[in-house]
């Protein structure tokens, strides 16, 4: 199944194709059992991962692809796996996955890097619809998702995702597994949805608090919080949080406590 020479990857779609079924089989294996699940794949490209998923016999697989040039490849796979595989030619950013598939759902994808973070945050709005995500990201983004406090990579993305899920980095991959080769390392991560958020908080309000505080991550938390409240010092004292700490030193729970105290 070598279609690489026939399709010129589009840079504006972040197209980096994986041609090795050994690699895609490995990624799909990280998703665990899929025979009892419906699967979503975003950006299926040449279909290598698509075959790896279908060969593990999911209840159903739906792939969403924006590039019309790849339709012929996937129409053939639809014929080969009749009733099991559905191909949607569309922009994944414009689709609410709840409208096209029934749970339980796992997402397995080599995400287009230019929309990967936006997609993930969008899915967090209805994370209870999903069981898990097994996703390839640019390594720099994956490191931010799994980062813990007191780490330079820890920030808004880490907190918004980890509030709602358990995250695990599975493996790093070099550019050589892709065609064309990107200039960055890549990583596969597993995101396992929690039945409930770790802490009670207004998610959109938390997002705003994080955006404000981490926009000046080297400043002390008392300084950045003054943009959001008139009593930052008193609030931090009441929560027993050292006001000399920087945002990257605070736990998810502490950020939720702060958010809940801001009117």
Swiss-Prot record:
Annotated residues for binding of S-adenosyl-L-methionine: 18, 43, 65, 91, 110
GO terms for cellular component: cytosol
E.C. code: 2.1.1.182
Keyword Kinase on entry: no
Source taxon at top rank: Bacteria
GO MF: 16S rRNA (adenine(1518)-N(6)/adenine(1519)-N(6))-dimethyltransferase activity; RNA binding
Cellular localisation: Cytoplasm
Enzyme class: transferase
Keyword S-adenosyl-L-methionine: yes
PROSITE patterns: RRNA_A_DIMETH, SAM_RNA_A_N6_MT
SUPFAM superfamilies registered for this protein in UniProt: S-adenosyl-L-methionine-dependent methyltransferases
Catalyses which reaction(s): adenosine(1518)/adenosine(1519) in 16S rRNA + 4 S-adenosyl-L-methionine = N(6)-dimethyladenosine(1518)/N(6)-dimethyladenosine(1519) in 16S rRNA + 4 S-adenosyl-L-homocysteine + 4 H(+)
Swiss-Prot/TrEMBL keywords: Cytoplasm, Methyltransferase, RNA-binding, rRNA processing, S-adenosyl-L-methionine, Transferase
The protein's role, per its UniProt record: Specifically dimethylates two adjacent adenosines (A1518 and A1519) in the loop of a conserved hairpin near the 3'-end of 16S rRNA in the 30S particle. May play a critical role in biogenesis of 30S subunits.
Family, as annotated: Belongs to the class I-like SAM-binding methyltransferase superfamily. rRNA adenine N(6)-methyltransferase family. RsmA subfamily.
Protein name, per record: Ribosomal RNA small subunit methyltransferase A
Naturally occurring in which organism (per UniProt): Ehrlichia chaffeensis (strain ATCC CRL-10679 / Arkansas)
Name of the gene this protein is made from: rsmA
